[in-house]
Swiss-Prot record:
Single GO molecular function: cellulase activity
Species, as recorded: Arabidopsis thaliana (Mouse-ear cress)
GO cellular component: extracellular region
Protein name according to UniProt: Endoglucanase 22
Phylogenetic classification of the source organism: Eukaryota, Viridiplantae, Streptophyta, Embryophyta, Tracheophyta
Protein's gene: GH9B16
Keyword terms of this UniProt record: Carbohydrate metabolism, Cell wall biogenesis/degradation, Cellulose degradation, Glycoprotein, Glycosidase, Hydrolase, Polysaccharide degradation, Secreted, Signal
EC number: 3.2.1.4
């Protein structure tokens, strides 16, 4: 097959920008620590973010089920299971492919963060094949209040779907998360790994048997939308779940599934997207690993589409490609910009890592003389620029990781960080009272160390402030892939 050629502006790739030196080890440790600030439920004695305390201890009570635990997705107090599952998948992928670059302490903490998510996801599928749990908390009342998690008195309604109502996207992502986590824990805790895999298998069976989107069900749509509607459909999560189960089990039946459903499920559509809603980019990169390692010809089209994604990082390529801000930030429209930057950069580095370890010909990315190819170093340079932009090498000279460096936003859109801790202010802060903290001109009393926030706009401008949620709200699904990127650059600085 003739190699796919992607032309681009060479100077962007072969000349490194003048940057300050960053402490990737410190950033990595902090990016994992962030997850302790998002914990829900009973907090352990070894909790390092001591301004956080137990919260939401009756979750699931309205359905007579234990749904205590898990993560709050962002700056509010809702547990949305769809993005939580994606977060868990990416924490697992970071551990699987980049755990060898982490220190023993960082790898341990990453696995602790992963287990916190996977333990909770096991609860969400504990009643399959009859019922799957979708979410805990009512967004409208929650968003009408500004309450720290420890005090919240808004309804903690748990939502569930009964079979045969469809939930392919939610169940497919949970299956992917549990399968990926089973791989991450296989060496450290084989019994737990098997438990995760067994549940991944039956969750995927539910996803495939009851096809359709979980947000198409009236009883959950009003609770989930517009926050985490499955806009991209459910088919990508079925491919995503199958790809992770193939990697976890090695079974050829998942190869067959991927081959039979590739076109009808849209693996070559919107291939330059990756995040909590759209898994197409991730599917193609993950399946490409099979082609590199085992030369499975039947799934080679996934690798071909992954190549198109890689080419889209370079501006003068034919067809769709990424957009960049004047300061070099990979930019896609959305409510939280850096989630796109981090997730897509993760795929670039991961694909190049797979390619560099294979015997296959590198991807040709320039057709002039001399020829240039997508090598590990080229990917490193591109990924390095995006990581360093987040850490402070940007026109604002601002670190978008809270607690990293000397200049980072002191006010973020986060209830727990902006409210006084119950350690210093044990009196409950009620719904309307909390808005005093929201509108305070003072810095947040609690530093949510390691949180990567939404970030700047397409012109590299950053206004900040608690009212500007798109710029200052952190999310778990930004940090999860960032863990892998930081681990790699800690061991392989450009």
């Amino acid at each position: 097959m003739k190699p796919l050629v992607c032309s681009f502006i060479v100077i962007l790739l072969i000349l490194l920008p003048t940057t300050i030196s960053h402490d990737y080890s410190d950033a990595l440790t902090k990016s994992i620590l962030f997850f302790e600030g998002q914990r829900s439920g009973y907090l352990p004695r070894e909790q390092r973010m001591t301004w956080r305390h137990n919260s939401a201890l009756n979750d699931g009570k309205n359905l007579n089920v234990d749904l205590v635990g898990g993560y709050y997705d962002a700056g509010d107090n809702i547990k949305f299971h769809f993005p939580m599952a994606f977060t868990t998948t990416m924490l697992a992928w970071s551990a699987i492919d980049f755990g060898s670059y982490m220190s023993p302490a960082d790898l341990r903490d990453n696995l602790v963060a992963l287990r916190w998510g996977s333990n909770y996801l096991l609860k969400t599928v504990s009643q399959l094949p009859n019922r799957i749990f979708v979410q805990v908390g009512e967004p409208t009342p929650d968003h009408q209040c500004w309450e720290r998690p420890e005090d919240m008195d808004t309804p903690r309604t748990a939502y569930a779907l009964e079979a045969p109502k469809p939930a392919s996207d939610l169940a497919g992502e949970i299956a992917a998360a549990l399968a990926a986590a089973s791989i991450a824990f296989k060496r450290f805790d084989p019994r737990y790994s098997k438990l995760l895999l067994d549940n991944a298998l039956r969750t995927f069976e539910y996803a495939d048997s009851h096809r359709g989107s979980y947000t198409n069900n009236p009883e959950t749509k009003l609770a989930v939308c517009p926050f985490y509607c499955s806009v991209n459909g459910y088919e990508d999560e079925l491919l995503w779940g199958a790809a992770w189960l193939r990697r976890a089990t090695g079974k050829d039946s998942y190869i067959k599934y991927l081959v039979e459903n590739r076109q009808s499920f849209g693996s070559d559509s919107n291939y330059f997207e990756f995040g909590w809603d759209n898994k197409v980019g991730g599917v193609n990169v993950l399946v490409a690993k099979e082609v590199f390692e085992k030369n499975v010809a039947a799934i080679a089209p996934y690798k071909d589409t992954a190549e198109k994604l890689m080419c889209s990082f370079f501006l003068e390529t034919p067809g769709a490609h990424m957009s960049y801000s004047p300061g070099g930030l990979l930019y896609k429209p959305g409510s939280s910009q850096l989630q796109n930057t981090v997730a897509l950069s993760f795929l670039l580095l991961t694909y190049a890592n797979y390619l560099s370890k294979s015997s296959q010909q590198p991807l040709q990315i320039l057709s002039t003389t001399p020829l240039w190819y997508l090598t590990q170093r080229i990917a490193n340079i591109v990924g390095f620029e995006k990581v360093d932009y987040i850490l402070g090498d940007n026109p604002m000279k601002m670190s978008y990781m809270i607690g990293y460096g000397n200049r980072y936003p002191r006010q973020i859109h986060h209830r727990g960080a902006s409210s006084p801790s119950i350690t210093t202010h044990p009196t409950p802060v009620k719904c309307s009272e909390g808005w005093n903290s929201f509108s305070s001109p003072n810095p947040d009393p609690n530093v949510l160390v390691g949180a990567v926030i939404g970030g700047p706009n397409i012109d590299d401008k950053f206004v900040g402030g608690r009212t500007n949620a798109s710029e200052t709200e952190p999310t778990t699904y930004i940090n999860a892939p960032f863990v892998g990127l930081l681990a790699y650059f800690k061991a392989n600085p450009v």
